[in-house]
Amino acid sequence: MMRKEGAIFFFELVRLIHVKKPRIVFLENVKNLVGHDHVNTLRIILETLKDEGYQYRYQVLNAMEYGNTPQNRERIYIVGFRDEDDFAKFHFPDPIPLTKTLSDIIDFDKKVDDKYYYTKDKYKGDIYEQLVSEMSEMDAIYQWRRKYVRKNKSGVVPTLTANMGEGGHNVPLVRTYYGIRKLTPHECFNTQGFPESFKLANLSDSRLYKQAGNSVCVEVIHRIAENIVKAIK
């Protein structure tokens, strides 16, 4: 079932589509949309696009397989076309090798602001000691899973979420020469494919983390957009 805030946004989008009748509609959402619990939501979206005169294709793509981005981020992408010829010529991009590594998005050698580090003073009890004991590698990603530490064996960042900056088990952790810390906001944007030169807005860290978690993988969007352009030429 579509959540209230999501439903409001979607039907406002439908209103704009109905009025403007764009040639292309390009949507992105969480992978769970194709799962059993949300199959009715996906059906509503697809039926609405059809009612508005669009033929569509959709596919679940992972950023680390289709965007050369070291993040395990699966999302459903929906592309709708008003023109039948455009629709016939469009296809989603093929998977590509993952050549970027964690070191391309995380500066393990740099000392960052103290606020990002996990220290004994900040984390009382045995949590800090457990992190130190189990986070043995300096080129890996870890997560604190409430009662244990888990290393990401795929060598990529787990899916970034909008509540990552709030702590808890959603925070990817790294160990560097300067200590154990969470990813900085800029590193989170790097993880979404934004360039190192990207300038962050003058916002609180919590809002920046939320923006990064709600963002899209730049390279996946770029590759789909390239195929859309080819289809409508």
What residue ranges belong to the model's regions?
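Class I S-adenosyl-L-methionine
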Residues: 1-159
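C-terminal target-recognition/interaction regions appended to catalytic cores
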Residues: 122-233
